Structures are given as structure tokens and as C-alpha cells.
Design a protein with these regions (language model features):
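Active-site loop/lid in soluble adenylation, ligation, and acyl-transfer enzymes
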Residues: 1-45, 49, 53-57, 127, ...
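Well-ordered beta-strand positions
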Residues: 23-24, 64-65, 137, 162
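Short connector loops at helix/strand junctions that flank enzyme active sites
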Residues: 25-27, 49, 65-69, 131, ...
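Extended cationic-aromatic binding surfaces that line active-site or macromolecule-binding grooves
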Residues: 25-38, 71-78, 96-100
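Short glycine-rich loop/turn motifs that provide flexible caps or phosphate-binding loops at active sites
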Residues: 32, 50, 59-60, 139, ...
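Short, electropositive, low-hydrophobicity segments enriched in small/polar residues
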Residues: 37, 64-65, 149
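A glycine-rich, hydrophobic loop/mini-helix early in the fold
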Residues: 44-83, 209
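Catalytic beta-strand/loop module used to bind and position nucleotide/cofactor moieties
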Residues: 78, 82-213, 245, 249-262
């Protein structure tokens, strides 16, 4: 989360080229949307017992259990030629990139339409319980959940692509209690890459094919680069925020303001 925000801030400040990043989580964690209250929507005691970290995202949306997955993040200026200026347009382009990448894996995905399903109130805090418009479905089941943040002419969108999904563990940390009905509902709502392809692939190979999907849809060459010195410095400062319970639990504001380049 600190790296995502550091890249986002530096892109806004220095008008950098778009960045696409893929990463995983260790140990397992639950990320919560910017506006969520984990004291009401998570089983914090169970998270602590299982060694599952809790971190608040800069983006909105609902709770996501991060375990065996690939998280992608895209950072760019609003109006950058590769992406439409509006939120839904940006979502769709990024989803098209992911659809193409999944196709290279042999996974046929499509975009969800608006209001295609009624939200289950018992599972309302769980991101994968229902798709939003332009999110990815495989055979009607959600395989990727995404959220976006915009400020000062830039956007950050990140999302989770499931490799496998442990329904029992996910519900045990997201819900105060769960029933067999909850488990069945969530299991029937979720798809995972290594469960829908004939032969599971190494994570690095999956990332390479997803990257190819972005390159082909956007018509660009993607060049691998390390973090800049400015991003590293900012990431180190932001780590204090993302390790702080006042941010993760209470959403206390951090002291590093967003700013444009002068």
C-alpha cells in the first residue's frame, strides 16, 4: 500500500508516465476501503488470532482478503492518452487489459453490467460478494475486484486477481460469524485463476501474460524499472502510516499532503 501511494503521489507531482505494478501479500491480510470501519465490518479478534494483518486502502470499496492472489495497480494522470478521463471509462480500459491477459491464460472473462445482482446484506462488507460495473466475471462469478482513487489530476486503481480462494478463511476474518449458507453464497460468487485453467501456472508466468495483455490493449511497450529515489523516500515515510493503528482502524489523517508540481 505504501508503494502504491508513493508512486501515485510522485506521478501527480512530477507528471510521470503511467505505472503498472503486480505484487502479492505475505503474510495474508485484509485490506479495507477508505471509508470502512473495521470495528463494525471485520472480525478483528480472529484476524489477530490468525496473524492476518489489517490495512486501510487509499481507495474506497469493501473488504478484501488477500492471500493467494496477484494484486495489480495502475497509476496515471487523468486524461493520459492511454486512459479515458472519466472513472467508468478508465475502469473499462483496465478491465479490457485484464480480460486480454486472462485470455492468454486460457480464461474467458467478461465485464459485469451495472446492477446485475442484488447485494446480500450479510456479505455486504466483502468485495467479492457481488460485482460492480466493468469488473471481471468468469462464468458469472467474480474473479477480480478493483477500486480507484482520484485526486489532483491523477488516479490510482488497484485490484485483486484470485489465484485460489479459501472461502472459510476469508469469511472467518471478514464476518463476525458465518454459516454454511454464507459459505455457499460466497463460494458460488467467486472464481479463481488456478481453479479455472487446465494446468496451474507459476505466478511469474501469470504476471508476464497479464502484462502482455496491458501492452497489447494499450498499444504500448512496458519497460520494467525500479522505484525512483523519490518514491523510495516517500514509501519509507508512508510505511509509518500503514503500520499505524490510528490510520488502519480509526482512519486518522496522515500528515503528508497531496500536492501538485509547482
Amino acid at each position: 500500500m505504501a508503494i502504491d501511494e508513493a508512486i501515485f503521489r510522485e506521478t501527480i507531482k512530477d507528471k510521470k508516465k503511467p505505472t503498472i505494478r503486480f505484487y502479492g501479500w505475505h503474510p495474508a491480510a485484509v485490506s479495507i476501503g477508505y471509508f470502512q470501519d473495521p470495528r463494525k465490518e471485520l472480525n478483528i479478534e480472529q484476524c489477530n488470532n490468525m496473524g492476518v494483518d489489517i490495512v486501510r486502502r487509499l481507495t474506497g470499496g469493501k473488504s478484501v482478503f488477500h492471500n493467494d492472489e496477484i494484486t495489480y495497480s495502475v497509476v496515471a494522470g487523468v486524461g493520459e492518452k492511454s486512459f479515458p478521463a472519466d472513472i467508468l471509462g478508465t475502469y473499462k480500459v483496465i478491465s479490457d487489459c485484464l480480460v486480454q491477459g486472462l485470455a492468454y491464460l486460457g480464461v474467458k472473462a467478461n465485464l459485469a453490467e451495472a446492477c446485475r445482482a442484488k447485494k446480500d446484506m450479510d456479505l455486504r462488507s466483502c468485495c467479492f460478494s457481488v460485482p460492480s460495473r466493468n469488473e471481471l466475471l468468469v462464468a458469472g462469478r467474480k474473479i477480480c475486484g478493483s477500486a480507484q482513487k482520484r485526486t489532483n489530476g491523477g488516479f490510482l486503481q488497484h485490484g485483486s486477481l484470485l489465484l485460489t480462494f479459501d472461502t472459510v478463511k476469508a469469511l472467518s476474518v471478514i464476518l463476525p460469524f458465518s454459516t454454511s449458507e454464507h459459505l455457499a453464497k460466497l463460494r458460488n460468487s467467486v472464481a479463481a485463476i488456478n481453479e479455472v485453467i487446465a494446468n496451474p501456472l507459476e505466478t511469474k508466468e501469470i504476471c508476464n501474460l497479464l502484462k502482455k495483455g496491458f501492452a497489447d490493449v494499450l498499444g504500448v511497450e512496458i519497460v520494467e524499472e525500479p522505484l525512483t529515489s523519490g518514491e523510495i523516500t516517500l514509501k519509507n515515510n508512508l510505511m509509518k502510516k500503514y503500520e499505524d493503528l490510528r490510520w488502519n482502524i480509526e482512519r486518522k489523517k496522515h500528515l503528508i499532503p497531496f500536492r501538485n508540481r509547482r
